[in-house]
Structures are given as C-alpha cells and as structure tokens.
Amino acid sequence: MSKLTTGSFSIEDLESVQITINNIVGAAKEAAEEKAKELEKAGPTLFPGLESYRDDWNFKLLDRYEPVITPMCDQCCYCTYGPCDLSGNKRGACGIDMLGHNGREFFLRVITGTACHAAHGRHLLDHLIETFGEDLPLNLGQSNVLTPNITISTGLSPKNLGEIKPAMEFVEEQLTQLLATVHAGQESAEIDYDSKALFSGSLDHVGMEISDVVQVAAYDFPKADPEAPLIEIGMGTIDKSKPFLCVIGHNVGGVTYMMDYMEEHDLTDKMEIAGLCCTAIDLSRYKEADRRPPYAKVIGSMSKELKVIRSGMPDVIVVDEQCVRGDIVPEAQKLKIPVIASNAKIMYGLPNRTDANVDDVVEELKSGAIPGCVMLDYDKLGELCIRLTMEMGPIRDAEGITAIPTDEEFADWVAKCADCGACMIACPEELDIPEAMGFAKEGDFSYLEELHDQCIGCRRCEQVCKKEIPILNIIEKVAQKQIAEEKGWMRAGRGQVSDAEIRAEGLNLVMGTTPGIIAIIGCPNYAEGTKDVYYIAEEFLKRNFIVVTTGCGAMDIGMFKDEDGKTLYERFPGGFECGGLVNIGSCVSNAHITGAAEKVAAIFAQRTLEGNLAEISDYILNRVGACGLAWGAFSQKASSIGTGCNILGIPAVLGPHSSKYRRALIAKTYEEDKWKVYDARNGQEMPIPPAPEFLLTTAETWQEAIPMMAKACIRPSDNSMGRSIKLTHWMELHKKYLGKDPEDWWKFVRNEADLPLAKREALLKELESKHGWEIDWKKKKIISGPKIKFDVSAQPTNLKRLCKEA
C-alpha cells in the first residue's frame, strides 16, 4: 500500500500543468449530507449527533425501561483527584456521583465495542477499495434494501464500495464526539450517559454493516443464501497427519491471501487451515457464493484458543484482531509454534518483518531465532504463512511436541493436588476442580472430563495453584477421546435476510402468528458450558420460532448432535422462516439481524428508513416480536451490539456473568402509567400489556432464560391468533422449566380469543375465580375484566408526532 508523506512543491516555472485532486478528507461526507437533504421522504435525524435521539426517543425508552445499575466497586479511580469513595451517595472530588460514574463505565464499554467494529470496517473498506476499486458493486443477494442501518442513520443507500465512505466517516466523527464525553469534567448525568450509549449502539450497527457488506461483496461470500454450505466444526475435524495453519481473530482480510496461495499451489488437500472466533466463520464463507466444496474448517470460539495451542496441533498461528488471547506468543513459544501478527491492532511486541524478504523470514521463524513476527503486507503474508506451515509441520511432527502430559506425568500432577480450593475460587465459572481432582486420585476421571466443555480456557486456576499444576492440561488429557469425537456441522454464514423473505414473513411477525425471532449471538463465557445455547436453540426451533445466530453462538450450536447423529443445522432449514435456523455470519453480521427487523418496517409496513430511527424503532418495539440472547457475553463488543438492539426496541437476555457490565434496563410492570401509548389514528392514549418488560437483563440459568425470552416476544399489535400462540408457548415453557404457570399471564388477555386454545376453559375459570372477570359461560366469552381492549385496527405508537391529529 502506498504511503502519504508531507512535503511541498512549486509550479511557478511549469507550463500546462493539470492538477487532479482525487479525494479530500471529509469531502465525501459533506457531499453526502447535502445529497441527503434533497431526499423527498426522510425522517428528522439524517446524520444524527449526540443529542439527536435524546428527547424524541431515548428518554422515552429510559422512562419506561429504567436503568438498574450494578457497580463493580464503590470507588472512582479516573483522575489524580482520586481514588474517591462514592458509597452512601457521596460525590467524588470532581462532583460526579455513583450513578454518573457507573453510567460512564457502562458507556465506555459500549463505545469501545463500537470503535472496535468501526475500525474493523475502516480497515476492510480501505483495503478493498485499494484492491478492487470504488466501483465494486454491493451484490448482497436478491434485495433492494441493502444497508438499512446506514440508511436509517444517514439517508444514504450505497450501491458500491465508494459510496460507503460517507457513512464510515460519519461513524468515526461521532465516535470522537462520544469519546470526548468520557473525559473528567464532562458529562455527569447517568441518564445522559445511557442516552449516549444508545446512540453509540446505533453507530455500532452501522460499523458492523459496513464491515460485512464490503466483505460479502468483495470476497464472494454467500449472498442471502439459505442453502449455504455446511462447514465442519470442532477440534476433532483437524487431520493431525497434515501441517496445520491456525488463524485466530475477526478480520478475514489477510486470511483470504493465504487461501488464495493454497489454491494457486494446489495445497488445499495437503494441509489444514482452520480458525477460531469469527475469522473462522468468515474464512468458511470465502468464495462460497457458488457453494463450492469447502475445505476450510472451524474449530470454535475464544474459549478453545488455549486448549488448541496446548494440544500442540497448530504448526503456525496467525492472529489478526479482536478476541485474541494476550498470552498466545508465550504459550506458542513453549511448543515451537511461530506466531504471525497480521494486523496493526495486535503486534505483541514482535519484530516487524513487513519489508523483509519472505525467504529470510521463513528461515528466521523456522530456526526459532524469533518467536514470531509482524507481517502487514498481505501478499507476503499469504506466501509466508503457507510456506512456513508446510515446513514447520514435518519438523514439529517429528518432535511430537505437545503440552498434554504423559500418563506418568498426569498421575504425578494429580497426586500433588492439596485440595486447597484456590483454583475453584479463581475460576470465573466456579468449577469444582478440587472435587474432580479428588475423584481422579481414586481413578475416576469422569469428573475431570466433564469440565472440558464447561472450562473457558482462561488458566486463572493455574496461576493460583501452589503446586504449579497445569490444570488445563490435566483436563485436556482426560478429554482426548471427547476432543477426537468433537465433530459437528455449522452452516456457513449466509449473509443478510433477503427482501423476499421479509415479504413472506413480515405479516406473520407483526400479527404474531410467527411467534418471534430469537437471536442467539455473543461470546463463550457460559456459566455451565456450551450446550446451553444448543438447548435454547432447539427448544425455540421445535416451537416454530425463527432462530437467527452469529459468531460464537452460531459455532457452539453446531457442536452437538441428537440421537440420530444430526446437528441442528442439518435438522432445520436455513431460511428466514418459521422453524428456520439462520446463521447470518460472524460478529459483524449482527447488523443484518437488526437490519431484518428494520426491513420489516420498511418493506412490509412501507415506513421510511432514511433518517428515521425513532419511528422505525417505535414500530419494532410495538409490532415485531424479537428477543436477543447473548448467553456468554464477555466483551465490550457484546455490550455495544446489545445496546444497538435496545435502541431499536429489541430486548436482550444476557447470561449470569453480565451483571458485570454494570447496567440493565428493566421496566416496572406495576406502574400502569408507563404502559400507555398513543393510537396513531386519533392521538388518544391506549393501554398496552407490559411487554416487553425489559430491554436488557440477565438470567441465572438457561431454564430461566427460555420462558423469559418467549414472553419478551409478545407485542401490543399481536392479533388474537398471534397472542394465543405466544401465550401458549410462554405458559408451556414457564411450566416446563420453572414448574408452574406464570403469575401475570392474565395481564396479556384482551378477549377470550387470546387464550391458549387447549386450556381456554380452564383459564376462563381462573379469570373468573381469581381475578373477578365476568364470563358468559354459554358463549364462553369474556364480558368484563380486561383493562386492555382488543382493536385490530389500532395503531400503537410512543411518538405523539406520528398521530394524525399531530
């Protein structure tokens, strides 16, 4: 890539000089803003700023869904005035209180995640424009609405790479403004930090959308393809007889050069290339638009990074960016695995060999003279990684290098355990390692083996062990058979939901006859192991919900099989339809999940997308039954993704660790004034049921999460058939997993047709006896009782300005 340098030149003595100015920084955005102003139909918030959504939408959400703060500690250590004790409603030296400080802490996580995705998008956009040119069309499948998140924010509907640049500049500009508010002596009100966090969440989905649409277009990924190929997944899929290149991270740009080199030199069947985290998902999408037989494999999520390294299987490791462990170099160095850093965001202190000759770098790394290197030239990267893997494979195979102990070493380590319990205290998942070690001493290794799936591979246990027992290696030793059999299938990320699919399902979603969209996303910080998300997905799929998934969740769902040996991806269709399991793609593909909800409003309801976030979000909150699940959320990106869903009116359930994010958004269902909206036909207030009753909350167990999510798909606009279907699922799931009927089911009944058909008579009796409702038993109709009346033509909205009288 050419580098810009400063300098000057004179044209005084030159004749017939023509100067061409190719690009002025910021000019694209300015031109786009002027173009957006000319739109015939547009909402009030084209190119919004920090304040744009505050009063019209964000504060309305935050009034109903009040922030519940969960501080990690009572101190603020932000500046040299501190540390300040903020307990007991005290204020710090700068004047900030605990609410404001906690709001800032949550907000900081959100903008960090937003920046991560935006920087990912900027890197890909610049690289792909340099490689393919600005005119490369955004071919994303059979759709006209290509970039709903970009359109909502800017009014723009880009059709090629170059037209995306103004949206990218917009996100970057607003991120700078947002980051400035974190400085000491800036914002101090918790409610305004929450509003800014919601705005940042909306920007995050723009950044993610940019990241994914440019790579789908340039790298020939599947394009809204429900039949995208099935990809092998799991540690057991790796052929140990072949040299193995392991790639880790989220930015697939450099990996495509490695795959190209493999194909050009006929090496696809002579070595293995597989990945961890979202780079794995995206390398399995590369050139799969025509459904060619895939050869790249997926190992799994971040929780498997250290396990894979300790196994000794990789011959070379390449890292790019995001969710990459900080100890990969020292861990790999112990096992003679060279590490190559391919992105400037992670360089690990390694020597930079970007300008070096590839032959020389191969020799340096092969000899062990350096543990790894930085290589930012993608052409060289592709050659270096493949050649090095092919040479390191035989060398490491001959030495049989692995961190897994021998039987004798295993017995010695187990015998050393003093049963002090320090490992269990240090474990984020509180795994009972001492108990498992105790049984292992007696020859029963099943308890240790059970820990394999539950362990997130963080090695905190090892660092506190007084006996210096390599506990992770011990667990992996007894799980060798389990690891060898870890072979599943994951459908390659298919890309966005097509316009045709939205047209087919839009009415069902708004009326409620499709019970809802369940979005399983996020990280692998599971409290009880990866199978939780499999159980959740299976339950909702069997009940005809649409289950969409991305990232770690998409991978972990594919790890398990039923009694017939089939994964969920083999059992259920890949289309956006009732009972469909839709792997959208990697983390950045999450933008297509919110995009699908936005497209329901735009395509089915003909609402204007351009600069119209509040109206679109209002429509989704009142009409589109959807709920997200980030069961293992750990990262800042997870908080920004979830917050971007929240501003759109989409609730999200997080796992038990997620109280550490410091903030939830939970409504008080007993405050009836909070559960009123306007009828857009006449501007009159109308009561609605308390649904969804949260925008962001946590659950302790997957059994608790399932009925919570089913309930969160209830919407005010459900027709009677839809409400009956949703109540049936919610009540059955509540009974199945929590052992009793929900206490507040009656609040969602508007007339007898809303009741679950199979239990209608019994529920009518309960309404009469427990709640005093009047029932006509001859006609089996409700005469009086419900506070909410059903009106199929009602137009619920939270925005007074959308009412006809306004």
From Swiss-Prot:
[4Fe-4S] cluster 4 binds at residues 427, 455, 458, 461. It catalyses: CO + 2 oxidized [2Fe-2S]-[ferredoxin] + H2O = 2 reduced [2Fe-2S]-[ferredoxin] + CO2 + 2 H(+). [Ni-4Fe-4S] cluster binds at residues 250, 278, 323, 523, 552, 587. [4Fe-4S] cluster 3 binds at residues 417, 420, 423, 465. Pfam families: Fer4_7, Prismane. Coiled coil: none annotated. One of its GO terms (molecular function) is anaerobic carbon-monoxide dehydrogenase activity. [4Fe-4S] cluster 2 binds at residues 76, 79, 84, 94. It comes from the Archaea. Its EC number is 1.2.7.4. Pathway: One-carbon metabolism; methanogenesis from acetate. CDD domains: ACS_1. Binds 7 [4Fe-4S] clusters per heterotetramer. CO binds at residue 117. Signal peptide: none annotated. Its cofactor is [4Fe-4S] cluster; [Ni-4Fe-4S] cluster. Cluster B is an all-cysteinyl-liganded 4Fe-4S cluster; cluster C is a mixed Ni-Fe-S cluster which is the active site of CO oxidation. Cluster D is also an all-cysteinyl-liganded 4Fe-4S cluster that bridges the two subunits of the CODH dimer. Contains two additional 4Fe-4S clusters, dubbed E and F, that probably transport electrons from ferredoxin to the B cluster. Heterotetramer of two alpha and two epsilon subunits. The ACDS complex is made up of alpha, epsilon, beta, gamma and delta subunits with a probable stoichiometry of (alpha(2)epsilon(2))(4)-beta(8)-(gamma(1)delta(1))(8). Part of the ACDS complex that catalyzes the reversible cleavage of acetyl-CoA, allowing growth on acetate as sole source of carbon and energy. The alpha-epsilon subcomponent functions as a carbon monoxide dehydrogenase. This is Acetyl-CoA decarbonylase/synthase complex subunit alpha 1. It comes from Methanosarcina acetivorans (strain ATCC 35395 / DSM 2834 / JCM 12185 / C2A). The lineage of its organism: Archaea, Methanobacteriati, Methanobacteriota, Stenosarchaea group, Methanomicrobia.
